[in-house]
Every structure is written in structure tokens, then in C-alpha cells.
Amino acid sequence: MTLRARHLLGIEHLAPDEIVTLLDLADRYADLNRRPDKHGDALDGLTQINMFFENSTRTQASFEIAGKRLGADVMNMEVRASSIKKGETLIDTAMTLNAMHPDLLVVRHPHSGAVNLLAEKVNCAVLNAGDGRHEHPTQALLDALTIRRAKGKLHRLNVAICGDIAHSRVARSNILLLGKMENRIRLVGPRTLMPAEIAELGVEVYEDMKAGLDGVDVVMMLRLQKERMDGGFIPSEREYYHRYGLDAEKLAYAKPDAIVMHPGPMNRGVEIDGTLADDINRSVIQEQVEMGVAVRMAAMDLLARNLRAAREGVRA
């Protein structure tokens, strides 16, 4: 049970059977994490460096907890205080880190493709923790695990992804993963927040929220990424919530057992009604956070197996 590639850079590189392999292992780690003794030894003796060029308390903490629960020596690199702020290039940084012989490198970067570039320059396993608008593979995997545990399957479901699609690497990774697993995907939101390459995605597009949610099994809301907008994308937050914010009235168009998701952090009263976000009968938002640790444990475990096998092969 392993992955074919040395790195986890995107969902686009994973085959359906690899997705299932990773989710099956993550399922076991999710159960382990609910026990009093949560620790495993899959990463014993390995060094994990978390290097985040964008702030992300949630994702960084999730990767740190995942690594420590499996026995890794975890270091969080403070990019703001590093040589990068003094003019060092990404390649210089990669080569410097490589000389220290880390085993796992977790990277988040504001530019699409930066993590792939870094992966070409190091000998360790690299995990993409989000790069620009490109991909966020572990978020899509944790969303998939959350869906599978809630619905009992991960195929032939109707999934609505709603909101700021254009600026969302989460949306792109989820579209790729859910498509590989034979689900029907709808994108719901204003035209100004739809990606230019929408015709290539193989999805249905709705500008009307109620029509887009009609009969769906899963409602996945996205954060309005105001920091990536120059203005003009939406008239106002109040108008956006009126048309595209998820509330009980709009959710009533989905199936009665439809689940509500959000990758966080949430803008309550903008993307989603706060009461609905906290509704334990419909919302699985806290389960997403929980599954994030399990998925990252599974991903690092599988990559570590490849790393150790490769090193054993060299020694042989």
C-alpha cells in the first residue's frame, strides 16, 4: 500500500486507486486519533520541515500535529524572519534546506507552481500545502474523507461547490478529485467569481443559488477571498450574502440529508449563516478539521514508506 510518486503536489497526479489507498489509511488514523493514546511510529527518526510563505494557522497546525503524532521531529520555519526576506530566491532556499537532509518538506506558497519548482531541487518528499490558485491536495483529500464517512460512499453524488471559485485552489483540487471518483459537480456563484477555464472543467455552472442546490447531496461553501480581489467582483458583502450566502431557506432546495461543508476560515454572515454552520445535524465543518489531521498523517506515512524504500534500494 503506497503512492507511486515521491511527492504529493496535486490531485491531478493521483490515480483513483491511490486516492482510495490514502483515504483508507486516513480512516484508520481518524479512529486512532480518537483514542487516549494517539501516537504511531510511522515517521520515527524522520525530520519534517513546515515552510509556509503564507499565513495559515489551521493548516500549519494540522501538519504539525500529524507529524508529531507519527513520531517525526517537526520544525516550523519562520519565513518572515528567514533569508527569503533578505533577498534569497526560492531555489537558494531549496538547496540550503536540501543540504540539511530533511525527510519531509511541507510547503505553502502564494505563487502557483512554486511548490513543484522546489520539489525539483530537493531529495526529500515534498507535500503541497497550497500554492497560489493552483492546488491544495490535502484539503481535497480531507473533504473527500469527510464526505465518504458522512454519506457512506464517494461516488455518484451530486456536489455543489459554491462561492469564490475563481480564486480558490480548494475548488480546483476538489473538482479534480470528485471528478476522478465519478461524481456530478456543480459550480454555483456569480460569473465574476468563476474561473476563465471553466469550459475545461467538465462541470455544470449555475448563477442562481437555489437552482444550483436543487437535489444535491453535498453543499461545499468557499471563503470569499477578498485579499485576492482588486474590487468589482461583488457589489457588497451584504448583497453577496443575500444572493449566495448559505442559509436555511437556500439549503431547503438540497436533499433533506445533504451535508454542509466549508474549508475555513469562515466569514459568518457572508458565505454562510452562523447558526447553520454550527448545526450538528447538517454541518460537518468540525469533522473536516478532524479529518485534516488524519489525512495528513496518512499522506506523510505513505510518502515516508516510499522514501525509506528508495533509500534501502540505494544501500542495496
Swiss-Prot record:
NCBIfam families noted in UniProt: asp_carb_tr, PRK00856.1
Function recorded in the entry: Catalyzes the condensation of carbamoyl phosphate and aspartate to form carbamoyl aspartate and inorganic phosphate, the committed step in the de novo pyrimidine nucleotide biosynthesis pathway.
Protein family membership: Belongs to the aspartate/ornithine carbamoyltransferase superfamily. ATCase family.
GO biological process assignments: 'de novo' pyrimidine nucleobase biosynthetic process; 'de novo' UMP biosynthetic process; amino acid metabolic process
Gene3D superfamilies xrefs: Aspartate/ornithine carbamoyltransferase
The keyword Zinc-finger is assigned to this record: no
Organism: Dinoroseobacter shibae (strain DSM 16493 / NCIMB 14021 / DFL 12)
UniProt binding sites for L-aspartate: 86, 169, 223
Protein name: Aspartate carbamoyltransferase catalytic subunit
Encoding gene (name): pyrB
Pathway annotation from the record: Pyrimidine metabolism; UMP biosynthesis via de novo pathway; (S)-dihydroorotate from bicarbonate: step 2/3
Xref: SUPFAM superfamilies: Aspartate/ornithine carbamoyltransferase
Subunit structure: Heterododecamer (2C3:3R2) of six catalytic PyrB chains organized as two trimers (C3), and six regulatory PyrI chains organized as three dimers (R2).
UniProt: carbamoyl phosphate binding residues: 58-59, 108, 136, 139, 264-265
The entry's keywords: Pyrimidine biosynthesis, Transferase
One GO MF term: amino acid binding
